[in-house]
């Protein structure tokens, strides 16, 4: 079990925090991650409440996609605009080995359904690990050729529990070189904002696009404007940092006012470091596993 149910933020607590961030912090986009958001019975209600908050322009979600298909229509009707589906293999046996479940077909059907009903943006997150799925790099590129999706290749990052090793990390430069040899027309798409996380590329005659998230070899800390509220209500100002502060406890135990919460958040942001540690230091830093942080 990732979290006890009593530890999770309630629907009302989530709504309160998003209202505060929108009003006081100028937040315009909210992404629901996890653990896995589709396991929450109140997910559609959460999306509906967030999408109605003044100032919120975009509600997105990151999911493993296994239980997504049947929920998509209601989520879209209630304000969900984009999804990221985490998918590290297109090979059935390998998918089962990596995820410990038989769900590849369900994930692929969820992606197709999202496209069919007109979800604005459909992204596929692929964490590339040497010796595990790096041989599927071009298969995922082909996926972007055949479908109007953005396939995002993510450099393998050090987190608790993933047995990270430098040699397992396939760099952006290496991935790009492999793809460019097969598709020489690959060309950079200009960033829409300074806070863009991925380096985005288009290829001639492709329905979709490909991107690279280069957290390890070419960090984007200087343009990062993201804050994370974890499922249990802890605030993280940096994905790779291990400093957290509990907004849930501030609300439940300390009966914090909105001004109190604002002060807590501002204090955490002021303590944020200019950039995250290097790969080797991160590998030995105590931090949550990625599944507990959310993608």
Name every feature range the model reports, one short phrase each.
Residues 145-146, 156-159, 163-295:
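Auxiliary Fe-S-binding modules of radical SAM enzymes
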Residues 36:
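Conserved G/P- and acidic residue-centered "switch" motifs that form tight phosphate/ATP-binding loops
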Residues 1-2:
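Short, small-residue-biased leader/transition segments that mark boundaries at the very start
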Residues 8-11, 15-31, 40-154:
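Radical SAM/AdoMet-radical enzyme domain recognition
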């Amino acid at each position: 079990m990732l979290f006890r149910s009593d530890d999770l933020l309630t629907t009302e607590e989530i709504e309160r925090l998003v209202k505060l961030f929108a009003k006081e912090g100028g937040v315009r986009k909210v992404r629901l991650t996890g653990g896995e958001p589709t396991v929450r019975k109140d997910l559609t209600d959460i999306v509906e409440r967030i999408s109605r908050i003044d100032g919120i322009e975009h509600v997105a979600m990151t999911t493993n996609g296994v239980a997504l298909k049947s929920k998509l229509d209601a989520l879209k009707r209630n304000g969900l605009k984009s999804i990221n589906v985490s998918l590290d293999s297109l090979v059935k046996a390998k998918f089962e080995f990596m995820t410990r479940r038989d769900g590849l077909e369900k994930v692929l059907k969820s992606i197709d359904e999202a496209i069919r009903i007109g979800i604005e943006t459909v992204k596929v997150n692929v964490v590339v690990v040497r010796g595990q799925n790096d041989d599927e790099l071009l298969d995922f590129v082909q996926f972007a050729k055949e479908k109007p999706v953005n396939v995002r290749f993510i450099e393998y990052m050090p987190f608790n529990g993933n047995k990270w090793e430098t040699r397992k990390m396939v760099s952006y430069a290496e991935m790009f070189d492999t793809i460019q040899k097969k598709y020489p027309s690959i060309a950079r798409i200009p960033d829409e904002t300074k806070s863009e996380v991925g380096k985005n590329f288009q290829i001639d005659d492709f329905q979709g696009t490909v991107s690279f998230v280069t957290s390890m070899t070419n960090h984007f800390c200087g343009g990062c404007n993201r804050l994370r509220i974890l499922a249990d209500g802890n605030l993280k100002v940096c994905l790779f940092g291990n400093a957290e502060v509990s907004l849930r406890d501030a609300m439940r135990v300390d009966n914090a006012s909105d001004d109190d919460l604002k002060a807590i958040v501002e204090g955490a942001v002021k303590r944020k470091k200019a950039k995250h540690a290097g790969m080797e230091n991160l590998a030995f830093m105590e931090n949550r596993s990625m599944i507990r942080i959310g993608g």
